[in-house]
Amino acid sequence: MVNDDFQEYVKQLVTKHRDERIYPFQYEGKKYWLKQPEKLKGIWLLLKPHPKKSFKNELYTLLKLAEQNAPVPKVSYYSDHFFVLENVGLTVSQWLCNKNIDEQQKFLIIYDACLALIDLHAKNLVHGRPAIRDITWDKGKVTFLDFESRSNSQNQNWVVIRDMLFFFDSLCREEDISDTFIQKVALYYQTHCKAKNWQNMIVFLQRFSWVYYLLLPFKPIAKTDLIAIYRLFEILLINKK
């Protein structure tokens, strides 16, 4: 239970930073994140028509997952129009793209992230978009962020496949992460996850491999999104044949 001084301080921040979706702050030596619904303008009103609903869904999801002991940030304080999260360290993306960290440490971090996602699925829970920028690592502790993009599908096999594809796609998006590194991560994940989940993902990629070949002529001019798709198919499917 947070004290009255903390609550009052947060309310002042909400008033002062009401147009900021995410605002970091320090209180008594600890770092927190204040999160509010997005304030959208222009085309984004069409692309994301229900920011308040998405915000409430994320808060509800965080609270429910915390009850199930899932690795999510602690919600320190919340109301209908904001919530405060305790800081949970750097993202996996930040760790892996840090040139001052050796590869052995990077493998340790990404392997921890793999096991955390596998464990989440073993509990019949899904994230919805477990990109490495939405996963943090701090001294061996893995935490999942940003549950706003969770799928409404009731097909458990599909939502697990979706999680796995988002995870590997996010690795493929990073220029600083080599194909060899991702191949080792894929082998580690395959070794430790349920065989059925890995096979389901491979079957999905095989079924949609035509997309890879359809997009292949554009490879010389491809940008980040397309490059990630090429790498995803090549690392997990094409080059393993």
Predicted regions and their residues:
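ATP-binding glycine-rich loop module of kinase domains
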Residues: 12-13, 18-56
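Conserved structural core of kinase catalytic domains
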Residues: 38, 54, 72-110
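Structural motif at the C-terminus of the N-lobe alphaC helix and the adjacent alphaC-beta4 loop
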Residues: 56-70
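Conserved hydrophobic alpha-helix
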Residues: 65, 113-120
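Catalytic-loop of the protein kinase fold
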Residues: 122-132
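Conserved protein kinase catalytic/activation segment
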Residues: 134-146
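C-lobe/activation-segment region of protein kinase-like
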Residues: 143, 147-241
